[in-house]
UniProtKB/Swiss-Prot annotation:
The gene is Segment-10. It comes from Bluetongue virus 2 (isolate USA). Disulfide bonds: none annotated. The keyword NADP does not apply. InterPro entries: Orbi_NS3. This is Non-structural protein P8. One of its GO terms (cellular component) is membrane. Plays a role in the inhibition of host innate immune response. Interacts with host OPTN and thus inhibits the recruitment of TBK1 to the host Golgi apparatus. In turn, downstream partner IRF3 cannot be activated and IFN-beta production is impaired. The chain crosses the membrane at residues 119-139, 162-182. It is found in: Host cell membrane; Host Golgi apparatus. Belongs to the orbivirus NS3 family. The keyword Transmembrane applies. Forms homooligomers via coiled-coil motif. Interacts with host OPTN; this interaction inhibits innate immune response.
Length: 229
């Protein structure tokens, strides 16, 4: 009887140990917190173009308002570079092709305006000389100025004094022509400056698009970061 109890105890002990091993081999859901595997980030980094564009605009606006045409052209170039960094790649290429088509026309218009300004400026100088001569002649006739030639006094002849009304009309016409030419030249200067600014902007935009990746290293023009090796 004692041996039977010992044998039964051994069987129950073996059965208990086997159940314990099976219980430990099971994975409980609440005990094991599963996490997804970690992968290296493969998505492109956020574009840094807006930041670069803001820095360029800050550079353009940091100085005082350009008092000279050179300073204004510099600010226009900065603005074009900032625009190139801000635009999308497709829009950038479209603008570059449009600029290449418009630039020859702008340069042609600029040359024509410069020639027109040169003609108007020459007309202004001629009108100024005519106005000065007629003013001197009219003033001399009115004051009856006498000239000394070889020790003898010579007065202005009477027939020359009769030309005073005509000289006065010529003087008024020359003065009016001077005013018109000066106003036209001022308007042409504004148009020329505006076209020069547009040419500078479009050329700067195209230069920014054509820049190579090596010139910007980690900040290329294609809109995303490049890893530095």
């Amino acid at each position: 009887m004692l041996s039977g109890l010992i044998q039964r105890f051994e069987e129950e002990k073996m059965k208990h140990n086997q159940e314990r091993v099976e219980e430990l081999s099971l994975v409980r859901v609440d005990d094991a917190i599963s996490q997804p595997p970690r992968y290296a980030p493969s998505a492109p980094m956020p574009s840094s173009m807006p930041t670069v564009a803001l820095e360029i605009l800050d550079k353009a606006m940091s100085n005082t308002t350009g008092a000279t045409q050179t300073q204004k052209a510099e600010k226009a170039a900065f603005a074009s570079y900032a625009e190139a960094f801000r635009d999308d790649v497709r829009l950038r290429q479209i603008k570059r092709h449009v600029n290449e088509q418009i630039l020859p026309k702008l340069k042609s218009d600029l040359g024509g305006l410069k020639k027109k300004r040169a003609i108007i400026h020459m007309t202004l100088l001629i009108a100024a000389v005519v106005a000065l001569l007629t003013s001197v002649c009219t003033l001399s006739s009115d004051m009856s100025v006498a000239f000394k030639l070889n020790g003898t006094s010579a007065e202005i002849p009477q027939w020359f004094k009769s030309l005073n009304p005509m000289l006065g009309v010529v003087n008024v016409g020359a003065t009016f022509l001077m005013m018109v030419c000066a106003k036209s030249e001022r308007s042409l200067n504004q148009q020329i400056d505006m076209i020069k600014k547009e040419v500078m902007k479009k050329q700067s935009y195209n230069d920014a698009v054509r820049m190579s990746f090596t010139e910007f290293s980690s900040v290329p023009l294609d809109g995303f970061e490049l890893p530095l090796t």
